[in-house]
Amino acid sequence: MRKQWLGICIAAGMLAACTSDDGQQQTVSVPQPAVCNGPIVEISGADPRFEPLNATANQDYQRDGKSYKIVQDPSRFSQAGLAAIYDAEPGSNLTASGEAFDPTQLTAAHPTLPIPSYARITNLANGRMIVVRINDRGPYGNDRVISLSRAAADRLNTSNNTKVRIDPIIVAQDGSLSGPGMACTTVAKQTYALPAPPDLSGGAGTSSVSGPQGDILPVSNSTLKSEDPTGAPVTSSGFLGAPTTLAPGVLEGSEPTPAPQPVVTAPSTTPATSPAMVTPQAVSQSASGNFMVQVGAVSDQARAQQYQQQLGQKFGVPGRVTQNGAVWRIQLGPFASKAEASTLQQRLQTEAQLQSFITTAQ
């Protein structure tokens, strides 16, 4: 009888130990991934880019008797809980990624997300969202689920009692973004680099639309030689020597235009045939509506207008360039329905290999 009781006690102890280990591995209950039921929101923060995983910071580990398993599939991970704020001095500590800690960067520490990786952090109290780069482990020993740098906490306006939501952003090798953190979200590029303009010639053999691909360089006065002893502007054909027609999309300088030569005919038909103009038929078909298709954002207004005009001529739709802080958004539309905007999205993808998203006119 004593042996039977001893066996029962041992079995009960083993069962309790297993239950305790499982409890240690669990953290905060995982909410369902965000589902997009509204308009696309543009957020800023760290600029997500593809990075290989750190060789030493992505192994399962134990700390203070608690086991931690590294998240292998961030696409199935979301988490909500209280956020901590890491306020160490710059360079005072090394992160798990081997980098010196910098509180001015939009970074965060998480116990189990891959290093390095990116996540959208949402302040559930005020709705603010930013992108942070996960480059460290922690926090430990409290009920916090993530530790934010001071810069990230300030952008989100969080305190030590603020509840946040963590949604990973997955960066593919080609730079495309996916994952829970991209639901109803597009990330504003910090480099504002203009993508390579698509081939708008349709394979017809013309190179008129490929001219503006490079940056527009200033003309050096030292290369211009005037035959006029008074130093009058050069009147030969070329960029400053109109009347030679400029390539479509090329921007004229602010220099005064020389007097037209007698042999030049009045360019009365130029506005009607310029490829940068949107046809009246296209404008009348889509002049009203609340849906826009955004294809990019750049820091140069002139380049944004040039790019929008090229796309408008190619796809036969109106468009606009709007300012948002330091960048200029390139948008096509408006469209009366989201279905019409989606049709243009598909054409942009198949005919010009351009990524875009649908937004509402403001």
Curated annotation (Swiss-Prot):
Its EC number is 4.2.2.-. GO terms for cellular component: cell outer membrane; plasma membrane. Residues 262-276 have a biased composition (Low complexity). Keywords: Cell membrane, Cell wall biogenesis/degradation, Lipoprotein, Lyase, Membrane, Palmitate, Signal. A lipid is attached at C18 (S-diacylglycerol cysteine). One of its GO terms (molecular function) is peptidoglycan binding. It is found in: Cell membrane. Residues 285-361 form the SPOR domain. A lipid is attached at C18 (N-palmitoyl cysteine). The keyword Signal applies. Disruption phenotype: Deletion does not result in any obvious growth or division defects. It is an enzyme of class 4 (lyase). Residues 1-17 form the signal peptide. InterPro entries: RlpA, RlpA-like_DPBB, RlpA-like_sf, RplA, SPOR-like_dom, SPOR-like_sf. It is a lipid-anchor. GO terms for biological process: cell wall organization; FtsZ-dependent cytokinesis; peptidoglycan metabolic process. Its main location: membrane. It holds the Pfam family SPOR. PROSITE patterns: PROKAR_LIPOPROTEIN (PS51257), SPOR (PS51724). CDD domains: DPBB_RlpA-like. Gene3D superfamilies: RlpA-like domain (2.40.40.10), Sporulation related repeat (3.30.70.1070). The SPOR domain binds septal peptidoglycans and is required to target RlpA to the septal ring. Belongs to the RlpA family. This is Endolytic peptidoglycan transglycosylase RlpA. It comes from Escherichia coli (strain K12). The lineage of its organism: Bacteria, Pseudomonadati, Pseudomonadota, Gammaproteobacteria, Enterobacterales. The gene is rlpA.
